Amino acid sequence: MRIEQDLKLGFKDVLIRPKRSTLKSRSQVDLNRQFTFKHSGKTWSGVPIIAANMDSVASFEMAASLAQHNVMTAVHKHYSVEQWGEFVASQTAEVLQHVMVSSGTSDTDFIKLSEILAKSEDLNFICIDIANGYSEHLVDYVRKVRQAHPQAVISAGNVVTGDMVEELIIAGADIVKVGIGPGSVCTTRVKTGVGYPQLSAIIECADAAHGLGGQIIGDGGCSCAGDVAKAFGGGADFVMLGGMLAGHEQSGGEVVEQDGKMMVKFYGMSSQSAMDKHSGGVAKYRAAEGKTVLLPFKGSVDNTINDIMGGVRSTCTYVGAASLKELTKRTTFIRVQEQENNVYGKE
């Protein structure tokens, strides 16, 4: 047993200090990034926000909508190969280039992944996702997928420390997904006592990834546009959002009526709800590590994504960053004990 004495920080522990700026308007800020990925050699440009690979968030409808904003969607893994075929046939290359194909790590998952990728040469992104990215099995699976699909852009996770980021990049991942337990419907930290404050995880993992020419996705923990900006400021190349994009008409969640109001079911992918739906219930040897909530129906996701991007643009103007790429260099975090004045309720 050992104890690390360094304080680790989440988004609520800091604010970004403002700096002098020559920008006259938020409209001058460019949120598009261009990346050339280490192993695949592919180049992608767009707004590096990703809808999380949850079946009550990342539907085909969500992918089609967010692509119009140059934003990515990690489409959840529970669509069939046939459903993927129908989706691919109905969409343009521009939409498909903003889609990640999600995969588990079983032999069946590998076969399914290959069949989906064969549907279109415009499906370039793979999201290999398991809750515990510290498994040797994940590293072996990344190697296997890299060998089978050398031209694909592979993201893999989830992890929270630099050593495992390096391991996954060396094994063949272009991008590593960072975050254990910060999500709004994740209870891993409560059930297991395992986790890492998300901002510190992003800062440390970004340093490790960038040293090897890789990228990271900050996955989880964002509850407002300011948190998204803090994730980018901390060094995240991409930011993945679940709860912030749930509850919309494109999210795919079950709509129910409660007290005369339309509500949308949103749940973690290790929750009782998810395992009942996809695995025949919670296995006797494990515990559910997610919760199920009902969210007020939010309408179209277009309004929400515009609000998020508007907030990040505003952050950039406050620190003098003309582009999202400059935000990390212009960010100075200050530790705080308060975030906002809640006398009239939270925003």
UniProtKB/Swiss-Prot annotation:
It comes from the Bacteria. NADP(+) binds at residues 108-131, 216-239. GO terms for biological process: purine nucleotide metabolic process. The active site is at residue 186. Keywords: Metal-binding, NADP, Oxidoreductase, Potassium. K(+) binds at residues 181, 183. It is an enzyme of class 1 (oxidoreductase). Its EC number is 1.7.1.7. GO terms for molecular function: GMP reductase activity; metal ion binding. GO terms for cellular component: cytosol; GMP reductase complex. CDD domains: IMPDH. SMART domains: IMPDH (SM01240). Homotetramer. Catalyzes the irreversible NADPH-dependent deamination of GMP to IMP. It functions in the conversion of nucleobase, nucleoside and nucleotide derivatives of G to A nucleotides, and in maintaining the intracellular balance of A and G nucleotides. Belongs to the IMPDH/GMPR family. GuaC type 1 subfamily. This is GMP reductase. The gene is guaC.
